[in-house]
Structures are given as C-alpha cells and as structure tokens.
Regions:
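A short His-aromatic
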Residues: 111-115
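A short glycine-rich, Lys/Arg-flanked "PGG" loop and its adjoining helix->strand segment in the class I
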Residues: 120-135
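C-terminal helical/coil "lid" or tail adjacent to the Rossmann-like core of SAM-dependent
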Residues: 185-214
Length: 244
C-alpha cells in the first residue's frame, strides 16, 4: 500500500538528495560518452519516464536535450510543472500520455520499474517510443535482502540485481553495460529501512557540514568507479533494430 505522504516527501526532497544527484550525474556522463549531442541538426529528443519532481528534466535541458517527460503521480507532476522551459513538455500519466507520440533518441527511467507490476509491458511501451538503436538508461533499487520500509511506503513490487535486470531487458534491448551504484549507502539502507523499519534520516538531504562533505566525496568516487554491489543497479541499453 503506497503511503502518499511519504511519497510526496520523497519527491519534495529530491532536489537536495545527494544520492539522486550522483545517479543523475552518472546518466549524463553516459550520454556525453555516447556523443548523442553531436550529429543532430536539432536537439536530440529525450523522454524522462516517471520524472518525479522534475530535477532531471532541468539537468537534461542544461545538457542540450529536448525533453518530453511523463509522471503519473499528480503531486509529483505538479512539482515538475513549476519549472517551465521552451524545450520541455510534461504530461500527466505514463509514457502513453505523451501526445502526439514522439520517437526519442534516448529514454531515461530513474527508479520507476519497481513500481510497476507488469514490468514487461512497460518495457515494451518504452521500446516502442525509442528510435531504432535508441539509447535506454534505467536505474532500479538493488539487492532483494534490502527490501524494507522505504520500499513498502513507496509501493515497490521488487528489487533487482544485475542478472534480473539484464534478463528483463533482453526481450527488447541489448544491454551495453550494467553496474551497481550506492555501495556506501548499503549500511544505512540495511539499518533504517530493513532492520529498524523507519524513514531515512534527513542526513541524505543535508546541505552543509562535515556529513555533506563526506557524502559528496563518497558519491564522487562511485560516479567514477563501479563497485561489485550497491543499493541501485543502472543499465545502459540499446533498442534492437527493427527490420524494415
């Protein structure tokens, strides 16, 4: 059962969530590496599925993308629409709410699939909205044994690992890379969410002081180095070409 108050707080604090910022930096580094912004006469199209409060929308626009975003939660949608930009269109609903439909050069899906029971149907919809060989960047929570209070309050159905994520992507995508993120967050996740079954403390969104400095340093390390396990798993995949 989704806790709407908990979910709203999760969206509202995302702007200052250092963990989320690191994940978004990883995504943008990937998009820079594949050179999506070169060779286009116009801005490449990015669809942000489940955009939440809209933080990544801003970052993607700053990076040079034309962004189409969708968000099914009305509260998060309202937060996202507070940011207006000529290169941004936001729709209330899932990816099918984007009208008229667009074919994207890249689709980003941060922490969305775990909310969806019929995950294969959702992935097929995403594949149908990608251009041939389009890029798909997805992050999901990792490690089954960490499933706890945080997951329950947000209405998660599951957590993943590298193997299970690659398996579900296989039907429509070719995985280019799959890595973990959040190694240093494992102790806090285990203690607060799994053992104590309480909300994470406000430390995760701290904005100053020693704790913030330490967190920024650890996240900076994780952006550069993939550890053998973490609280999230992130995949970069290409849509399989459809024969004409």
């Amino acid at each position: 059962m989704i806790n709407n108050q908990y979910t709203q707080l999760d969206h509202e604090t995302r702007e200052h969530d250092l963990y989320a910022h690191g994940k978004y930096r990883l995504t943008l580094k990937t998009l820079e590496r594949v050179n999506l912004l070169n060779g286009h006469e116009s801005k490449p199209v990015l669809i942000n599925v489940g955009c939440g409060g809209g933080l990544f929308n801003k970052l993607a626009i700053e990076a040079g993308f034309q962004v189409f975003a969708c968000e099914p939660d009305p509260t998060a949608f309202e937060l996202a629409t507070r940011f207006n930009h000529p290169n941004l269109k936001i729709f209330l609903g899932d990816i099918s709410a984007i009208q008229p439909p667009v074919l994207a050069d890249v689709i980003v899906c941060h922490d969305v699939l775990e909310h969806i029971d019929a995950e294969n149907i959702a992935l097929r919809q995403i594949a149908d909205s990608l251009a041939n060989s389009g890029l798909f960047v997805i992050s999901v929570p990792a490690i089954d044994r960490l499933f706890g209070y945080h997951d329950e309050q947000l209405g998660h159905f599951r957590r993943y690992n590298k193997t299970t994520l690659k398996r579900i992507l296989h039907f429509d995508f070719d995985a280019q890379s799959v890595r973990y993120y959040g190694f240093f967050a494992i102790p806090a996740t285990l203690y607060y969410s799994r053992i104590k079954k309480v909300a994470y403390p406000e430390l995760i969104s701290a904005r100053s002081g020693l704790i913030t400095w330490i967190m920024k340093m650890l996240i900076s390390i994780e952006v550069r180095i993939a550890f053998p396990v973490g609280t999230s798993v992130i995949a970069i995949a290409r849509k399989r070409r459809v024969a004409k």
